């Protein structure tokens, strides 16, 4: 369960950070 959550977070966080900081 945990590794899957980490994998999802690793995929989602860069996208969220990109959207917030407008640095893509």
From Swiss-Prot:
Pfam families linked to this entry: Antimicrobial_1
InterPro entries tied to this protein: Antimicrobial_frog_1
UniProt keyword list: Amphibian defense peptide, Antibiotic, Antimicrobial, Cytolysis, Disulfide bond, Fungicide, Hemolysis, Secreted
Disulfide partners: 18-24
GO BP annotation list: defense response to bacterium; defense response to fungus; killing of cells of another organism
Any one GO CC term of the record: extracellular region
Tissues showing expression: Expressed by the skin glands.
Subcellular location field: Secreted
Coiled coil stretches, renumbered: none
Keyword Secreted included in the entry's annotation: yes
Keyword Disulfide bond: yes
Similarity section: Belongs to the frog skin active peptide (FSAP) family. Brevinin subfamily.
Function: Has antibacterial activity against E.coli and S.aureus strains. Has antifungal activity against C.albicans. Has hemolytic activity against rabbit erythrocytes.
Protein name as it appears in the record: Brevinin-1JDa
């Amino acid at each position: 369960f945990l590794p899957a959550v980490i994998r999802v977070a690793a995929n989602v966080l860069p996208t969220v950070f990109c959207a917030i900081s407008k640095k893509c």
